[in-house]
Swiss-Prot record:
Residues 1-50 form the SAND domain. This is Nuclear autoantigen Sp-100. SUPFAM superfamilies: HMG-box (SSF47095), SAND domain-like (SSF63763). Its main location: nucleus. One of its GO terms (biological process) is regulation of angiogenesis. It holds the Pfam family SAND. A motif (Nuclear localization signal) lies at residues 91-108. The keyword Plastid does not apply. Homodimer. Interacts with members of the HP1 family of nonhistone chromosomal protein, such as CBX5 and CBX3 via the PxVxL motif. Interacts with ETS1; the interaction is direct and modulates ETS1 transcriptional activity. Interacts with the MRN complex which is composed of two heterodimers RAD50/MRE11 associated with a single NBN; recruits the complex to PML-related bodies. Interacts with HIPK2; positively regulates TP53-dependent transcription. Interacts with CASP8AP2; may negatively regulate CASP8AP2 export from the nucleus to the cytoplasm.
Length: 242
C-alpha cells in the first residue's frame, strides 16, 4: 500500500492525505508532493486524488445563461485575443432564451440542474478564506491632511447655497458647488489655491516634526518595566526585613 509524502516530509495514507489536503487547501496547496515516484499532476489527471477545495465561493449558472456558453467558448477559441463584453453577452442570452422552443429549453434546464448539483457538492468542501486585513492604526493626534482649493471654496459657499435652497439634497448641493467652481474665473480661484498651498506646506512641516519626535520602541519599554518591577520587589524585601 503506497503512502504519500508531503513537502514537509510527513507521510500519509491516500485517505489521510485527502483529509490533510482539504485542511491545508485554503492556506497553501503545495505542488511538489511525491507518491512512489508519481507527480501530483499525474495523480490529479488520473483522479487518484481529489482536487483541493476552492477557497472562493462559486455561483450557479442560470438556465438562460447556458444558451450561449458553447458558442461563446467556440468564439473564444477562434479569436483568443478578442474580448467578450459581459453585459452584451447576458443580453444575447436573455434574447435567445425568449425565442427558443420549449423542447430546446429543457436541454438548458437540465444543464442548470447539473450545474446546481455540482455547485452543492463543491460547497460541502468549500473553505472560506480567513484572511482579514488588519486596520491600520490612526493616531488621533497626528496632523490632519489639508483640504484642496475646491473644498475650501465649498466650505465657504455651502452655507449660502443651503440657505437659498433648503430643500436641496447633498448630491444636488455638490453639483451646484461644482458648477460654481467651474464658472469661477482663474484669478478668483488663485485665492483658494494659494490658501491650499500654504496649508499643505504647514502640513508637511507638522508631519516632519511629528516623525522627528518618534515613539519609544517596545524593547525600551520592556527595560523600563523590568527596572520598575525589580525596584518594587527590592522595596517589598526591605519592608519584610524591617
Amino acid at each position: 500500500k503506497k503512502c504519500i509524502q508531503s513537502e514537509d516530509k510527513k507521510w500519509f495514507t491516500p485517505r489521510e492525505f485527502e483529509i490533510e489536503g482539504d485542511r491545508r487547501a485554503s492556506k497553501n496547496w503545495k505542488l511538489s508532493i511525491r507518491c512512489g515516484g508519481y507527480t501530483l499532476k499525474f495523480l490529479m489527471e488520473n483522479k487518484l486524488l481529489p482536487e483541493p477545495p476552492s477557497t472562493r465561493k462559486k455561483r450557479i449558472l442560470k438556465s438562460h445563461n447556458n444558451t450561449l456558453v458553447d458558442p461563446c467558448a467556440v468564439h473564444k477559441k477562434k479569436n483568443p485575443d478578442a474580448s467578450v463584453n459581459l453585459s452584451e453577452f447576458l443580453k444575447k442570452c436573455s434574447e435567445m432564451w425568449k425565442t427558443i422552443f420549449a423542447k430546446e429549453k429543457g436541454k438548458f434546464e437540465d444543464m442548470a440542474k447539473a450545474d446546481k448539483a455540482h455547485y452543492e457538492r463543491e460547497m460541502k468542501t468549500y473553505i472560506p478564506s480567513k484572511g482579514e486585513k488588519k486596520k491600520k492604526f490612526k493616531d488621533p493626534n497626528a496632523p490632519k491632511r489639508p483640504p484642496l482649493a475646491f473644498f475650501l471654496f465649498c466650505s465657504e459657499y455651502r452655507p449660502k447655497i443651503k440657505g437659498e435652497h433648503p430643500g436641496l439634497s447633498i448630491d444636488d448641493v455638490v453639483k451646484k458647488l461644482a458648477e460654481m467652481w467651474n464658472n469661477t474665473a482663474a484669478a478668483d480661484k488663485q485665492f483658494y489655491e494659494k490658501k491650499a498651498a500654504k496649508l499643505k506646506e504647514k502640513y508637511k512641516k507638522d508631519i516632519a516634526a511629528d516623525r522627528a519626535k518618534g515613539k519609544p520602541n517596545s524593547a525600551k519599554k520592556r527595560v523600563v518595566k523590568a527596572e520598575k518591577s525589580k525596584k518594587k520587589k527590592e522595596e517589598e524585601e526591605d519592608e519584610v526585613d524591617e
